[in-house]
Amino acid sequence: MDGLDGDEKVLEIARHKMSKLHSDIQFVHGFSFELPYPENAFDRVISSLMFHHLTREDKSKTLHEVYRVLRPGGELHIADWGKAQNAIMRTAFFSVQLLDGFLTTTDHVTGVFPELIRKAGFADVKEENRFMTVYGTLSLYSAKKLD
C-alpha cells in the first residue's frame, strides 16, 4: 500500500504516526496529476478530501492518471465534498469555499464532479453515500476501470 502527498512535511508526519503501528505503507512524494507509478499498478485507489483543492484542469489530469495506474477491473473510491443537498448545506459549504477557493470547489457543490470522473474513462460512477456535516455535504463516490 502506498500513500502519496506533494508535501514532504505531511509525509514525515504520516511516517512517524504509522511507524508506531509497524505498518507496511510506503509513503511517496509526488503529485496526483503526475503519478510516479507504471500503468496498471493498483487494484484500488482511494482519495479523501483532496479533489476539492484542485482546479478543474488538475482534477481531470488526476482522474486520467488514476485511470492509467489502475488495473482493468480496478476501483476508484473518493470521499470529498458533493452537491449541496439543500439550502442549509449550500450555505454551510460557503465557509469551505472561502477557505479553499471558489475556483476549485464549485465543481463539487454544483454536482459536476461525477461527470469529470466519467469523462476520464471510468464506468459505474456512483455516489454511494452522502453525509450532511457542519461544512456541507460530504459524498462517497465509487467508479471502475473496465478495460
Regions found by a protein language model. Give the residues of each.
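C-terminal lobe and adjacent flexible extensions of AdoMet/dcAdoMet transferase-like proteins
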Residues: 140-147
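A short SAM/SAH-binding and catalytic strip from SAM-dependent methyltransferases
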Residues: 44-57
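C-terminal alpha-helical "lid/dimerization" subdomain adjacent to the S-adenosyl-L-methionine
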Residues: 77-120, 124-139
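A short glycine-rich, Lys/Arg-flanked "PGG" loop and its adjoining helix->strand segment in the class I
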Residues: 60-72
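Class I SAM-dependent methyltransferase SAM/SAH-binding core
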Residues: 1-34
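A generic structural signal for alpha->beta connector loops
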Residues: 22-24, 73, 122-124
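A short acidic, Gly/Pro-enriched loop at the edge of an enzyme's catalytic core
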Residues: 33-45
